[in-house]
Structure formats: structure tokens, C-alpha cells
Design a protein with these regions (language model features):
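Zn-dependent metallo-beta-lactamase
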Residues: 1-41
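Residues at structural and domain junctions
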Residues: 10, 104, 152-153
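Hydrophobic ligand-binding cavity/cleft-lining segments
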Residues: 146-170
Length: 170
């Protein structure tokens, strides 16, 4: 396939942005819903709340590529997991397949979906798509300062900028 300059430029932009942290949803909403599908830099991702922790996985089951975000949070051997809606494969917060109901054998370590770094800060779930990134979530010292007024909202919005530019309004 021949890529146009625009497609190439978008892909290069997305690739360059993967090393940064991106705000994706409110922590409060995630704790309530447990599963939130998002698209970040062209990747379909499912944001999860498992074992009291945030997690982000590629939104695709390794079996028949069903969307994990259409599945449900379940328990397997006492641990939270996301279970695929199609054949019930279960994944932990690191993307490792931990249960295949149709077989009683040990599951290969190679059956896993990509996972991404997550962090909760300022009431927001942040995701970084690059595991080798050294970037940090922007410091907002005013967040805990009572002299400032907080306006807590989080609407789904498509942006074509990074979080620092959003914060600064540029």
C-alpha cells in the first residue's frame, strides 16, 4: 500500500507521542465502570481496574481478535481478570492469558496481549504506550493547593496535541 504524505505524517506524529503520558479517563469513572475502551494514538486500548490497580491492554483477544472491552471483569483463582466475550479466555492486568476454559493444560507464556504503563494521578488515569519511556506525568503543584479552584470534568474529546499544550491552552 502506498502511503500518502498525510498518513505518513500522522503515523510519525503518533510514534513520537508514544513516549509521553496521556490522560485517558477519570479514575472515579474507571472504579465504577471497571472497563473503558479508548483509542489512543491509533491504538484500540481497554482501560481496566483489576486487583485495585489500573491497567491498559490492547483491546483484542489473542484467540479470535474479539474486543476485550466487550467482555467482563471476572475472578480466576481469586484474582481479577478480564474475560473475552467470545470464548471466555481470561487475561490478567499484565496481558497474560491465565485461563482458557476449553483446555485443562498449562497455558503457554506466549499467549498474551500487549499491556501499557498506567498511573493514577490528580484523579485521572494516565497511559504511556512506550515501556522504555523516561517521561513523567506533568507536575501540577496547584492541584492540592486550596487557593485554587478545581473544575473536575472529563468528557470524551479527540485532541491532536499533547497534554502539556492542553494544560497551557496552546
Amino acid at each position: 500500500m502506498i502511503k500518502t504524505n498525510t498518513v505518513y505524517q500522522i503515523e510519525k506524529f503518533y510514534e513520537g507521542m508514544k513516549k509521553y503520558w496521556h490522560p485517558v479517563c477519570s479514575f472515579k469513572k474507571l472504579k465504577y465502570k471497571k472497563i473503558i475502551p479508548i483509542q489512543l494514538l491509533g491504538e484500540q486500548i481497554v482501560i481496566l481496574f483489576l486487583q485495585g490497580e489500573t491497567a491498559a491492554l490492547l483491546d483484542v483477544c489473542k484467540h479470535y481478535q474479539a474486543q476485550l472491552s466487550l467482555g467482563k471483569i471476572d475472578k480466576f483463582k481469586g484474582n481479577d481478570c478480564i474475560r473475552c466475550p467470545y470464548h471466555g479466555w481470561a487475561y490478567d492486568r499484565f496481558g497474560k492469558c491465565i485461563d482458557i476454559p476449553q483446555i485443562n493444560k498449562k497455558i503457554s507464556k506466549n499467549i498474551k496481549v500487549p499491556s501499557y504503563q498506567t498511573c493514577e494521578k490528580y484523579g485521572i488515569v494516565w497511559v504511556c504506550l512506550d515501556h522504555n519511556s523516561k517521561s513523567e506525568i506533568p507536575d501540577l503543584p496547584e492541584y492540592d493547593d486550596g487557593n485554587y479552584r478545581k473544575i473536575n470534568f472529563f468528557e470524551k474529546e479527540t485532541t491532536k496535541t499533547n497534554v502539556l499544550r492542553m494544560i497551557m491552552g496552546t
